[in-house]
Amino acid sequence: TSGLSQPCCVSGGKPEGRGGKEMTAKKMVRNIEPDDPMLQYSGRIDDDDPKAPVLIYAASWVKMIFTGTSVAVTLANHHAYWTNEMGYLLDGVQGRIRLLNDGKKKTYEIAEQLPDARHELMLFKRMDACHTVTFYGFTVDDGADLLPPEPKPARRMEVFGDSVSCGEVSEAVDYVGKEDPVHDGQYSNSWYSYAWMTARKLGAELHDTSQGGIALLD
């Protein structure tokens, strides 16, 4: 697999297979609401409730540029099947968050003890509709600043597809040229999907309407 970092849940219990500590009440933090104008969204997202947008399809994302030394995210995972994980890019380094499956709002630590400087975070949906995720905002240091987002690309593209378009088993590098392995979703990563790789090559914003095992025409 890719060797991505595996942060822990810091509120509401620890995900299976992950170590970690709970966030202490002594730390002063700033909560960033989902409708903060400094946040930037893209993808197939249900935004009927601006305080609780739902990320549905793979490669949907929310970005934030912030200062400070730590960042966490509050999510509610709506599990259908497989083990569910969210992806992120923090200052260009990719990681993933193992989600709990009880449908309740939880706060997950992404990073702490960062250099006290400018940081760029993109939280993205690694997996297809094996789950949906309600986003309730980020948590940063008390006194941290949010900075304006970078402009989106002028070019936009939309992909309709199945597993290769949403990145299912895209991290199963030991099975190249072989039959797909039996898995529980751990190899799925939309970042390495044909759809998102093509969008990055073309410098385009992507809307990825894809689901593993489902064709446009049956």
Could you say what each language-model-derived stretch is?
Residues 186-196, 200, 210:
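Extended, H/D-rich, highly charged conserved domains that either
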